[in-house]
UniProtKB/Swiss-Prot annotation:
UniProt entry tagged with the keyword Amino-acid biosynthesis: no
Enzyme type, top EC level: transferase
Pfam families: Methyltransf_5
Keyword Glycoprotein: no
Annotated function: Specifically methylates the N4 position of cytidine in position 1402 (C1402) of 16S rRNA.
Cell compartment(s), UniProt: Cytoplasm
Protein name (Swiss-Prot/TrEMBL): Ribosomal RNA small subunit methyltransferase H
Enzyme Commission code(s) on record: 2.1.1.199
Catalytic activity, reaction form: cytidine(1402) in 16S rRNA + S-adenosyl-L-methionine = N(4)-methylcytidine(1402) in 16S rRNA + S-adenosyl-L-homocysteine + H(+)
Similarity comment text for this entry: Belongs to the methyltransferase superfamily. RsmH family.
A GO CC annotation given for this chain: cytoplasm
Listed SUPFAM superfamilies: Putative methyltransferase TM0872, insert domain (SSF81799), S-adenosyl-L-methionine-dependent methyltransferases (SSF53335)
Length: 310
């Protein structure tokens, strides 16, 4: 089945308001996906370099945005490598940078990608088509490490029994698919503790997806690279969908906008450091009730933005 990567960009109006794209400016979209946010920037007259490691998403969005001609360029790459991509293209800096850390609906819904717990699919979960699959990961790590992943990345309160059940099923059942994996996870969680609004395997699947794709490592690399990617006056925005990502963005943006680096017990600043970034959003921007009604997945979206001063 071929995926349709068309999607409505989350927090579209807010992105335009915060990034303020102007004709001729150059933006870096680190997560092209369906091309929704890139399309917004291009419609405003900006130029866009967009990254994605999913070849199918890349091809679909490139075809959809072809009408913008040379103003749009797509590169197959992980957004963690944004700085290296720009250097390879001979670009010193951009006027704005954006990442949308959500998983696209086609990736979630297409069973053969291995993200769905409602339909059987292979234990894959890779955003692209290279690297370690979910099955590779589950066979490589031990029960203790699996429990850590579920606890830290999925905030799963029953991480230990879930990890134990998953490792046992992996050894005794072959082949194990995503639908059966979801059943195993649900069976390891007491029925009275099942979440009310989501499938009991949701936290586990989130944690495993993050681990397979090293999503937090990619985000950390993107955040660390911002000072070397943005031109003075350039703005960066990040849309996150769970607390781990939002916490990382919040803490990094706070560090970038902090001037003094002296120990807190010093009565007077001795370092003389000046902040290189300014916060644009004082707190995370959330989707409106109208947008959530139109696009329920926007409910958990959190947007933060900063501007480079010098």
């Amino acid at each position: 089945m071929s995926a349709d990567f068309r999607h409505e960009p989350v927090l579209a109006n807010e992105i335009l308001e915060l990034l303020r794209p102007r004709p001729g400016e150059l933006f870096l979209d680190g997560t092209l996906g369906g091309g929704g946010h890139s399309g917004l920037l291009l419609e405003a007259g900006a130029r866009v370099i967009a990254l994605d490691k999913d070849p199918r998403a890349l091809a679909a969005a490139t075809a959809r945005l072809a009408r913008f001609g040379e103003a749009f360029r797509a590169v197959r790459s992980d957004f963690r490598d944004a700085k290296n991509v720009l250097q390879a293209l001979g670009i010193a800096a951009v006027d704005g940078a954006l990442v949308d850390l959500g998983v696209s609906s086609p990736q979630l819904d297409e069973a053969e990608r291995g993200f769905s717990f409602s339909r059987p699919g292979p234990l894959d979960m890779r955003m692209g088509d290279t690297g370690e699959t979910l099955e590779d990961l589950l066979r490589r790590i031990d029960e203790r490490e699996l429990a850590r992943i579920l606890r830290e990345y999925g905030e799963e309160p029953f991480a230990r029994p879930v990890a134990r059940a998953v490792k046992a099923a992996l050894e005794t059942e072959a082949p194990l698919d995503t639908a059966r994996l979801a059943e195993v996870v649900a069976g390891a969680i007491p029925r009275k503790a099942w979440p009310h609004r989501i499938h009991p395997a949701t936290r586990t699947f989130q944690a495993l997806r993050i681990a397979v794709n090293d999503e937090l490592g990619a985000l950390a690399a993107w955040l660390d690279g911002l000072p070397g990617v943005l031109a003075p006056g350039g703005r960066a925005a990040a849309i996150s969908f769970h607390s781990l990502e939002d916490r990382m963005v919040k803490e990094k943006f706070r560090a970038l906008t902090q001037a003094c680096t002296c120990p807190p017990d010093l009565p007077v600043c001795a370092c003389g450091a000046k902040a290189s970034f300014a916060a644009i959003t004082r707190k995370a921007v959330k989707a409106s009730d109208e947008e959530i009604a139109r696009n329920p997945r926007a409910r958990s979206a959190r947007l933060r933005a900063v501007e480079k001063l010098r």
